[in-house]
């Protein structure tokens, strides 16, 4: 379970940061891995409205923090938290730049017809504070957040907002903040109790990525689908991405990782190996299954499709048996 917090306030340790820390802390106490991103520290080129992402599926900017990191984190996340103070009834510039650049993800879904496998289950929360008490104080932010979450492939699950909060440290004196956080997070509670299945192959570039993608798309509400490799490649296999795109599944912005890193972050209930069983660590209480599947890397596109289809069938049966 991975929760991504986006801290949109220019203040490093203000009320927004306190509220986000409370939310992330509650997620961590329930077993999630958490990460907080300070938007003010990111280098994000502003969207120019060029339309390239609508034609090609990728932004023209390839060397800033959105391209190198943020797209990957957004699609890795099970829960995305968008936290920010109100600036002129909307978001401050640093986090607004991140929101605007999510248009590239929107384009992949609504222009190219590809769906990130986490989209059906990913949850989004907005956290905000404002200095005034106007009835419509958060309306602009709420609408922006709703469309940002849709672009990033998340449902707009809930919002936690506070009026008449301005001075640093003021929210800490507000009664009931931690109760409000817990109440909101209950709407995502089923995600914290899913069974964890780790799919592992040698390079974490083809087979394990496809298996995790199919499992997440099919049963992400019941299964936390993890993936890793014994000797991970530097990046996922582009031919695998093309084969999955033929099924309408978007495998862009995927990273590889070691088996050791995966199990250190979250102990799986089941490990499914595909050619790397001898290198998987023994973990007491964890079940193991080995799928004898050939490595399609370096083979023909048709062979990649055959392995993809076999993995899809096995995942379908695994979900039926296990979840």
Where are these regions (language model features)?
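N-terminal beta1-alpha1-beta2 submodule of the flavodoxin-like/Rossmannoid cofactor-binding fold
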Residues: 1-107, 111, 175-195, 210, ...
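Conserved active-site segments centered on acidic
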Residues: 192-261
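Phosphate-binding/catalytic loops
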Residues: 127-134, 277-323
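Short, glycine-/small-residue-rich phosphate/pyrophosphate-handling segment
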Residues: 94, 110-155
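Residue-level recognition of beta-strand->loop/alpha-helix junctions
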Residues: 7, 38, 160-161, 229, ...
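Short, structured active-site "lid" loops
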Residues: 51-76, 240-280
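A short, gly/pro- and small-residue-rich
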Residues: 94-108, 146, 262-264, 270, ...
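Glycine-rich phosphate/pyrophosphate-binding loop and the adjoining helix
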Residues: 136-194
């Amino acid at each position: 379970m991975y929760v991504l917090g986006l801290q949109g306030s220019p203040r490093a340790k203000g009320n927004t940061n306190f509220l986000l820390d409370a939310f992330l802390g509650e997620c961590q106490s329930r077993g999630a891995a958490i990460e907080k991103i300070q938007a003010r520290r990111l280098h994000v080129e502003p969207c120019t409205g060029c339309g390239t992402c609508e034609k090609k599926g990728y932004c023209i900017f390839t060397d800033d923090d959105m391209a190198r990191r943020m797209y990957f984190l957004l699609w890795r996340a099970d829960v995305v938290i968008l936290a920010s103070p109100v600036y002129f009834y909307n978001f401050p510039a640093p986090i607004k730049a991140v929101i605007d650049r999510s248009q590239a993800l929107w384009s992949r879904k609504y222009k190219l017809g590809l769906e990130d496998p986490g989209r059906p289950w990913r949850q989004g929360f907005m956290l905000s504070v404002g200095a005034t008490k106007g009835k419509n104080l958060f309306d602009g932010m709420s609408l922006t957040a709703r469309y940002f979450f849709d672009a990033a492939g998340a449902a707009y699950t809930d919002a936690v907002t506070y009026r008449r909060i301005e001075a640093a440290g003021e929210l800490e004196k507000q009664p009931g903040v931690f109760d409000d956080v817990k109440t909101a997070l209950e709407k995502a509670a089923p995600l914290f109790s899913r069974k964890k299945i780790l799919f592992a192959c040698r390079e974490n570039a083809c087979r394990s990525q496809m298996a995790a993608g199919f499992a997440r798309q099919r049963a992400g509400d019941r299964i936390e689908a993890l993936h890793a490799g014994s000797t991970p490649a530097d990046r996922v296999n582009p031919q695998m991405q093309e084969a999955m795109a033929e099924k309408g599944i978007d495998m862009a912005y995927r990273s590889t990782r070691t088996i050791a890193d995966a199990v250190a972050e979250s102990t799986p209930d089941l490990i499914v190996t595909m050619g790397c069983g001898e290198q998987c660590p023994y973990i007491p209480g964890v079940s193991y299954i080995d799928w004898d599947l050939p490595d399609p890397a370096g083979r023909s596109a048709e062979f990649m499709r055959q392995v993809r289809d076999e993995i899809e069938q096995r995942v379908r049966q695994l979900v039926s048996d296990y979840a």
